[in-house]
Structure formats: structure tokens, C-alpha cells
Amino acid sequence: MFKTINKSITSILLFMISFYQKWFSPFFGPRCRFIPSCSSYGYEAITRHGPWKGGWLTLRRLSRCHPLTPCGCDPVPD
């Protein structure tokens, strides 16, 4: 049952990120200070690590993405 819940949450989160990338991101233009972009990072983190750890990694990344942070490469950890 827990695996089913994880798969459902993963699907919902990935859909939300894909929806953002397709419908909202083109209007805002490139704003992320990191490579890969925050939405790509979130998609990869959730795909690799599941909804809980991947979601936490994504939230940490989003909290670091602001004008006072230096730009750079920030890949998803293994």
C-alpha cells in the first residue's frame, strides 16, 4: 500500500512540475540561478529519490535560489 501511495504522489508531483515547465516557465523566461533549472532539478530529484527525499531536496534547492546566492552548477546528489 505504501508503494502505491508513493507512486501516486510521485506522479502528481511530476505532473505539476511538467505543467509548470510547459505552461508557466515560457512566460517568465530563464530566472533560475543554477544549472539545471530548479524545475528540472525537482523533476530529476523526485524521479531518482522518490517523493519524500526528492521533494525535500527540491525544497532545499528552491530556498537557495535567490539573488544573493552565486550562480553555478548544482546537480542532484546520488
Curated annotation (Swiss-Prot):
It is found in: Cell inner membrane. It comes from the Bacteria. InterPro entries: Membr_insert_effic_factor_YidD. Keywords: Cell inner membrane, Cell membrane, Membrane. It is a peripheral membrane protein. One of its GO terms (cellular component) is plasma membrane. It holds the Pfam family YidD. Could be involved in insertion of integral membrane proteins into the membrane. Belongs to the UPF0161 family. This is Putative membrane protein insertion efficiency factor. It comes from Prochlorococcus marinus (strain MIT 9312).
